[in-house]
Regions:
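Generic hydrophobic, helix-prone segments enriched in Leu/Val/Ile
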Residues: 20, 92, 96-99
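Generic structural signal for well-ordered alpha-helices
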Residues: 89, 119, 146-147, 182
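Short cysteine clusters
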Residues: 1, 42, 46-49
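Core AdoMet radical
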Residues: 29-41, 52-84, 97-115, 125-144, ...
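Flexible, acidic/Gly-rich N-terminal and inter-domain linker regions that tether
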Residues: 1-32, 52
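Alpha-helix-centered segments that form part of catalytic cores
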Residues: 84-92
Length: 184
């Protein structure tokens, strides 16, 4: 991901100085790259994951690590429901006129339909053709009804989280079915 970011959005020291005031503040807040980590709502329980990125881990993590209240507080539903709040999306859109890359992950981003309303707003504002969308997904869910929205963007890429093939992938990524991953 870092390679992708530095290749797509290179910024030199001169670029940084040009957009910065003498006191270190930005002259204007306009996002070129936005990463939307849409909470931890996920349909998979990967052995390499944790409750920060997968809601499927919350109950077991509670049993395994009962002494970690900081984790419990961090992953509580009240801290991860922000993707469902319209106020967040209304504030974000104000800074997206110069947006070039929108990186969307989760949990599993395709479980959070609210972000498609945001994409539609970018289309309605006439800025979608300059924006690349990049999804990080576990390849178990795709909603093809949104393809019409995606066509309005410069490009849509999918970074696929696959740890192995067949039964080994199903073992590592509990609740996945390999044939469904192949259908993605």
């Amino acid at each position: 991901k870092r390679y992708y970011e530095s290749r797509k959005l290179p910024m030199t020291l001169e670029d940084a100085i040009e957009i910065t005031n003498d006191d270190g503040t930005l002259k204007e807040v306009k996002y070129e790259f936005v990463e939307l980590r849409l909470g931890n709502h996920c349909n998979v329980m990967c052995r390499t994951c944790n409750p920060y990125s997968s809601s499927r881990w919350v109950k077991e993590w509670d049993v395994i690590y009962p002494e970690e209240p900081v984790i419990k507080e961090h992953i509580s539903q009240k801290n991860i429901n922000w993707p469902l709040e319209q106020d967040f999306w209304d504030k974000l859109i104000k800074y997206c006129d110069k947006l070039k890359v929108l990186y969307i992950n989760g949990g599993e981003p395709f479980l959070i339909d609210k972000h498609f309303s945001f994409l539609q707003t970018l289309v309605e504002r006439g800025i979608s053709k300059d924006i690349e969308i990049v999804y990080s997904t576990n390849c178990t869910i795709i909603n093809h009804t949104y393809e019409d929205i995606w066509k309005e963007f410069k490009s849509v890429q999918f970074m696929l989280s696959i740890d192995d093939i067949g039964e080994r992938n199903e073992y590592i990524r509990t609740y996945t079915k390999w044939p469904k991953v192949l259908d993605f």
